[in-house]
């Protein structure tokens, strides 16, 4: 499941690039808010930063008095192979790796100031930081500003409410897991993190309770009532953490040494020794990673449903956006048609002009389709036990006399149904390749670069045609499979019958053996031979149908419907394609980017699920 966390990381970063980080004011639908995440919540001086650094095993977070975290920090941890060097990357600094983590701390401070200024303001725009290390687990955490009770000098009077509002906007989402940090040397009833968590998650289904500063509690006291859930019950077990002391921080005590000291503390503690295996920052990180993987897997269907609904809404909005009035309709139509022809030429070159597109399509037919058919579970369907059951069910109360024809037919039909999967997968794979070639051809058509609106229209029209071609192709390939089920090749079994009779004359079989396991194995062998023959046929006919319905049609009529529409358009419509006012163009481009994000996310999620 590790690849699912990586997938969500990728989508989160893509969301930020297009301006989707939740709570948008422009009323565009948000994918960010639907993605499972772990938000780290705690009051000032709760040990929140120390917990994060313990999980990472590095000093990298800004420290100081007052409000230090003033923007959400999306911290994506990537486990690497042992022996590789720790490094960090920021989304806003492409192709730059940090190996000095003191510079990471400074860049967080600088990037915060670039948006908020140096006057202690806060911003909901997140900073994305990826850390690659063999000492971490695959995990994504969102570090939020610490909850506070008073404003410091230079901050607006509303800072307390502003921070709580920002934190609440994250943790109130049903897909957000809450990592609530509370110091053990304070009454849990006064914990800012637990107070907010209880308001948004009253049952405690999404909340992880973390107790810090266990080693700083008054002598003779412990936190067992909290850890064991007697004081505050949550769905998940509480985890105790022992952070570095301020003296350790001042001395730059290595985080690996701190981890070892933490383990030793719990292992030797008279209060917590029996809980040592489920205490500490290392255990917390593994627990969060495992849970996040599970939550992502359970949420995939709802995320896909949301993506599909939002795609429909965005496509409707793109169709409805108004455009300015044009002047010379004839010249504009001529220009548009010329750009369309240039796009179609490049698209065809991708298919059969020595470009990689045609080779990728051939690869689907030459490798993917045969491989998928070879992996079909015919062995399970034609196992001795399965054959006996199906033949017996087909015979009913009267066993067959010579050959179980009904049993044969049911076995064959059941086997043939398995071919539908590879057939559908081939159609969808070609569809994705053609859509990608459309995007590439649009990007490579120089004439279109001045007109983002026309680019969007052409992509939408081409994809609409490709969707129709896919529907026809899907019908055709499934019809090929259904045809094999509708009428079996009788001569194949007649030849088998003659061969069987000849073998019987040369080596007579007793009546008892005729209905024993050998008899049913022979049936399975005959059906398997027939299925092999059908497979060889479909490996040849499915590519023919797909090329005829999808590839050939894409070359011949990709923009036919668009041409029919544009030729009947009046000057106003043509002007809308070539010239928009800035506000409408900005809105259209925002919608187009969000639509592209959703479609890419859907394809990537589908691909990840398909691989599984």
From Swiss-Prot:
It catalyses: GTP + H2O = GDP + phosphate + H(+). Residues 242-245 are annotated as: G5 motif. The modification N-acetylmethionine is found at residue 1. Belongs to the TRAFAC class dynamin-like GTPase superfamily. Dynamin/Fzo/YdjA family. SUPFAM superfamilies: P-loop containing nucleoside triphosphate hydrolases (SSF52540). It comes from Arabidopsis thaliana (Mouse-ear cress). Residues 32-301 form the Dynamin-type G domain. The keyword Ribosomal protein does not apply. The lineage of its organism: Eukaryota, Viridiplantae, Streptophyta, Embryophyta, Tracheophyta. InterPro entries: Dynamin, Dynamin_GTPase, Dynamin_GTPase_CS, Dynamin_N, Dynamin_stalk, G_DYNAMIN_dom, GED, GED_dom. Residues 68-70 are annotated as: G2 motif. It comes from the Eukaryota. Forms homodimer and may homooligomerize and heterooligomerize to form the phragmoplastin complex. Binds to PHIP1. Putative microtubule-associated force-producing protein. Has a GTPase activity. GTP binds at residues 45-50, 213-218, 243-246. Its main location: cytoplasm. Its EC number is 3.6.5.-. It is found in: Cytoplasm; Cytoplasm, Cytoskeleton. One of its GO terms (molecular function) is GTPase activity. This is Phragmoplastin DRP1D. The gene is DRP1D.
């Amino acid at each position: 499941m590790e690849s699912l966390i990586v997938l969500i990381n990728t989508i989160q970063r893509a969301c930020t690039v297009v301006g989707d980080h939740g709570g948008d004011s422009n009323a565009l639908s948000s994918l960010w808010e639907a993605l499972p995440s772990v938000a780290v919540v705690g009051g000032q001086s709760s040990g929140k930063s120390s917990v994060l650094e313990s999980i990472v095993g590095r000093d990298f977070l800004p420290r100081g008095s007052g409000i230090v975290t003033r923007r959400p920090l999306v911290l994506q941890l990537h486990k690497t192979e042992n022996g590789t060097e720790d490094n960090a990357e920021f989304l806003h600094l492409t192709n730059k790796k940090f190996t000095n983590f003191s510079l990471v701390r400074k860049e967080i401070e600088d990037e915060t100031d670039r948006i908020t200024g140096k006057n202690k303001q806060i911003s909901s725009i997140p900073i994305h930081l990826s850390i690659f290390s063999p000492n971490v687990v695959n995990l994504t955490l969102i570090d939020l500003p610490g909850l506070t009770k008073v404003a410091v000098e230079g901050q607006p009077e509303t800072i307390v409410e502003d921070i709580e509002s920002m934190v609440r906007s994250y943790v109130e989402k049903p897909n957000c897991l809450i990592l609530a940090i509370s110091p053990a040397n304070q009454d849990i009833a006064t914990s800012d993190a637990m107070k907010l968590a209880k308001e948004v998650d009253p049952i405690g289904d999404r909340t992880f309770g973390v107790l810090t500063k266990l080693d700083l509690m008054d002598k003779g006291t412990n936190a067992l009532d909290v850890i064991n859930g007697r004081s505050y019950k949550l769905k998940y077990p509480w985890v105790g953490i022992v952070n570095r002391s301020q003296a350790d921080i001042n001395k730059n005590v290595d985080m690996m040494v701190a981890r070892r000291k933490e383990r030793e503390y719990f292992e030797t503690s008279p209060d917590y020794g029996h809980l040592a295996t489920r205490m500490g920052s290392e255990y917390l990180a593994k627990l969060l990673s495992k849970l996040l993987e599970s939550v992502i897997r359970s949420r995939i269907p709802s995320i896909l449903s949301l993506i599909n609904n939002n795609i429909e809404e965005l496509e409707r909005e793109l169709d409805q956006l108004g455009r300015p009035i044009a002047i010379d309709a004839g010249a504009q139509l001529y220009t548009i048609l010329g750009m369309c022809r240039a796009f179609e030429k490049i698209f065809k070159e991708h298919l059969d002009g020595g470009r990689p597109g045609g080779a990728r399509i051939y690869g689907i037919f030459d490798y993917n389709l045969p491989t998928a058919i070879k992996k079909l579970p015919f062995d399970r369907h034609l196992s001795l036990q399965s054959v006996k059951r199906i033949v017996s069910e087909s015979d009913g109360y009267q066993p067959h006399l010579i050959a179980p024809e009904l049993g044969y037919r049911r076995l064959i039909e059941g086997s043939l149904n398995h071919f539908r999967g590879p057939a559908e997968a081939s159609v969808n794979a070609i569809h994705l390749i053609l859509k990608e070639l459309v995007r590439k051809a649009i990007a490579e058509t120089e004439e279109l670069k001045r007109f983002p609106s026309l680019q969007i229209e052409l992509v939408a029209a081409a994809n609409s045609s490709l969707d129709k071609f896919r529907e026809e192709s899907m019908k055709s390939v499934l019809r090929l499979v259904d045809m094999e089920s509708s009428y079996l090749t009788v001569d194949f079994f007649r030849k088998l019958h003659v061969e069987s009779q000849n073998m019987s004359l040369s080596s007579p079989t007793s009546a008892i053996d005729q209905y024993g396991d050998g008899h049913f194995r022979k049936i399975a062998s005959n059906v398997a031979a027939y299925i092999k023959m059908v497979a060889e046929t479909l490996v040849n006919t499915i590519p023919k149908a797909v090329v005829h319905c999808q590839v050939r049609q894409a070359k011949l009529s990709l923009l036919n419907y668009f041409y029919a529409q544009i030729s009947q358009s009046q000057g106003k419509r043509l002007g809308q394609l070539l010239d928009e006012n800035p506000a409408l163009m900005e809105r259209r481009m925002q919608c187009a980017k969000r639509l592209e994000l959703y479609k890419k996310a859907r394809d990537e999620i589908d691909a990840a699920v398909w691989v599984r």
